[in-house]
UniProtKB/Swiss-Prot annotation:
Compartments it resides in: Cell membrane
UniProt record similarity statement: Belongs to the TatB family.
Principal location: membrane
The protein's name in its UniProt record: Sec-independent protein translocase protein TatB
Annotated keywords: Cell membrane, Membrane, Protein transport, Translocation, Transmembrane, Transmembrane helix, Transport
Protein source organism: Saccharopolyspora erythraea (strain ATCC 11635 / DSM 40517 / JCM 4748 / NBRC 13426 / NCIMB 8594 / NRRL 2338)
Amino acid sequence: MFENIGWAELLVLIVAGLFILGPERLPQGAAWLGRTVRQVKEYATGARDQLRSELGPEFDELRKPLEDLRGIRNFDPKRAMTNHLFDGENPLDGVTRNGSTPSSPSASAPRPADQRPLAPGEKPPYDSDAT
Protein backbone atom coordinates (compact mmCIF):
# COMPACT_ATOMS: atom_id res chain seq x y z
CA MET A 1 0.00 0.00 0.00
CA PHE A 2 2.72 2.46 0.94
CA GLU A 3 5.59 1.02 -1.09
CA ASN A 4 5.90 4.24 -3.15
CA ILE A 5 6.51 6.46 -0.12
CA GLY A 6 10.20 7.09 0.41
CA TRP A 7 12.11 8.62 3.28
CA ALA A 8 11.90 12.12 1.80
CA GLU A 9 8.10 11.99 1.57
CA LEU A 10 7.84 10.57 5.07
CA LEU A 11 10.00 13.39 6.42
CA VAL A 12 7.82 15.97 4.66
CA LEU A 13 4.69 14.40 6.19
CA ILE A 14 6.22 14.46 9.68
CA VAL A 15 7.29 18.09 9.35
CA ALA A 16 3.86 19.04 7.96
CA GLY A 17 2.19 17.20 10.87
CA LEU A 18 4.40 19.03 13.33
CA PHE A 19 3.44 22.42 11.86
CA ILE A 20 -0.27 21.63 11.49
CA LEU A 21 -0.84 19.94 14.86
CA GLY A 22 1.80 21.68 16.88
CA PRO A 23 4.00 20.03 19.48
CA GLU A 24 1.22 19.78 22.11
CA ARG A 25 -1.32 17.94 19.89
CA LEU A 26 1.20 15.83 17.92
CA PRO A 27 1.16 12.82 20.33
CA GLN A 28 -2.65 12.59 20.15
CA GLY A 29 -2.50 12.88 16.35
CA ALA A 30 0.12 10.13 16.10
CA ALA A 31 -1.95 7.88 18.39
CA TRP A 32 -5.07 8.52 16.28
CA LEU A 33 -3.14 7.76 13.08
CA GLY A 34 -1.79 4.53 14.58
CA ARG A 35 -5.26 3.41 15.68
CA THR A 36 -6.73 4.25 12.27
CA VAL A 37 -4.03 2.38 10.34
CA ARG A 38 -4.40 -0.63 12.66
CA GLN A 39 -8.20 -0.60 12.20
CA VAL A 40 -7.92 -0.38 8.39
CA LYS A 41 -5.45 -3.26 8.44
CA GLU A 42 -7.86 -5.34 10.55
CA TYR A 43 -10.71 -4.56 8.13
CA ALA A 44 -8.60 -5.65 5.16
CA THR A 45 -7.50 -8.85 6.91
CA GLY A 46 -11.09 -9.62 7.90
CA ALA A 47 -12.35 -9.06 4.36
CA ARG A 48 -9.63 -11.31 2.95
CA ASP A 49 -10.37 -14.05 5.49
CA GLN A 50 -14.11 -13.80 4.80
CA LEU A 51 -13.50 -14.01 1.06
CA ARG A 52 -11.19 -16.99 1.56
CA SER A 53 -13.77 -18.80 3.70
CA GLU A 54 -16.60 -18.14 1.22
CA LEU A 55 -14.65 -19.07 -1.91
CA GLY A 56 -12.65 -21.93 -0.42
CA PRO A 57 -10.06 -23.38 -2.81
CA GLU A 58 -11.19 -21.04 -5.61
CA PHE A 59 -9.57 -18.17 -3.70
CA ASP A 60 -6.10 -19.60 -4.35
CA GLU A 61 -7.01 -20.01 -8.03
CA LEU A 62 -7.93 -16.31 -8.15
CA ARG A 63 -4.69 -15.27 -6.45
CA LYS A 64 -2.47 -17.25 -8.86
CA PRO A 65 -2.96 -14.91 -11.88
CA LEU A 66 -2.35 -11.89 -9.66
CA GLU A 67 0.92 -13.36 -8.42
CA ASP A 68 1.91 -14.11 -12.02
CA LEU A 69 1.21 -10.49 -12.97
CA ARG A 70 3.28 -9.32 -10.02
CA GLY A 71 6.17 -11.42 -11.34
CA ILE A 72 5.81 -9.93 -14.84
CA ARG A 73 6.12 -6.41 -13.44
CA ASN A 74 9.90 -6.86 -13.07
CA PHE A 75 10.25 -8.69 -16.38
CA ASP A 76 13.40 -8.06 -18.42
CA PRO A 77 13.06 -9.60 -21.91
CA LYS A 78 16.79 -9.53 -22.63
CA ARG A 79 17.65 -11.38 -19.43
CA ALA A 80 14.80 -13.87 -19.92
CA MET A 81 15.91 -14.74 -23.46
CA THR A 82 19.54 -15.07 -22.37
CA ASN A 83 18.57 -17.37 -19.51
CA HIS A 84 16.33 -19.43 -21.79
CA LEU A 85 18.73 -19.78 -24.70
CA PHE A 86 21.99 -20.16 -22.82
CA ASP A 87 20.83 -21.80 -19.57
CA GLY A 88 21.80 -18.82 -17.45
CA GLU A 89 25.26 -18.37 -18.97
CA ASN A 90 25.81 -15.02 -20.61
CA PRO A 91 27.88 -15.53 -23.77
CA LEU A 92 28.36 -11.77 -24.05
CA ASP A 93 30.43 -11.48 -20.89
CA GLY A 94 33.63 -9.74 -21.86
CA VAL A 95 32.30 -8.31 -25.14
CA THR A 96 32.16 -4.56 -25.58
CA ARG A 97 29.19 -2.67 -27.04
CA ASN A 98 30.71 -2.48 -30.52
CA GLY A 99 30.97 -6.28 -30.70
CA SER A 100 34.72 -6.61 -30.31
CA THR A 101 36.26 -8.52 -27.47
CA PRO A 102 38.39 -6.44 -25.15
CA SER A 103 42.07 -7.22 -25.19
CA SER A 104 45.14 -5.80 -23.60
CA PRO A 105 45.94 -2.26 -24.71
CA SER A 106 49.36 -3.26 -26.01
CA ALA A 107 47.88 -5.85 -28.36
CA SER A 108 45.18 -3.61 -29.80
CA ALA A 109 47.13 -0.36 -30.22
CA PRO A 110 49.28 -0.03 -33.34
CA ARG A 111 52.97 0.30 -32.64
CA PRO A 112 54.48 3.49 -34.02
CA ALA A 113 57.77 3.15 -35.86
CA ASP A 114 59.61 5.94 -34.07
CA GLN A 115 58.32 7.53 -30.87
CA ARG A 116 61.22 9.67 -29.72
CA PRO A 117 60.60 13.22 -28.48
CA LEU A 118 61.23 16.03 -30.95
CA ALA A 119 64.28 18.19 -30.47
CA PRO A 120 63.80 21.95 -30.09
CA GLY A 121 63.15 23.46 -33.53
CA GLU A 122 62.59 20.08 -35.19
CA LYS A 123 59.39 19.70 -37.24
CA PRO A 124 57.19 16.64 -36.80
CA PRO A 125 57.14 14.13 -39.65
CA TYR A 126 54.73 15.00 -42.46
CA ASP A 127 52.69 12.39 -44.32
CA SER A 128 51.30 13.77 -47.59
CA ASP A 129 48.96 10.78 -48.04
CA ALA A 130 47.32 11.37 -44.67
CA THR A 131 46.11 14.89 -45.44
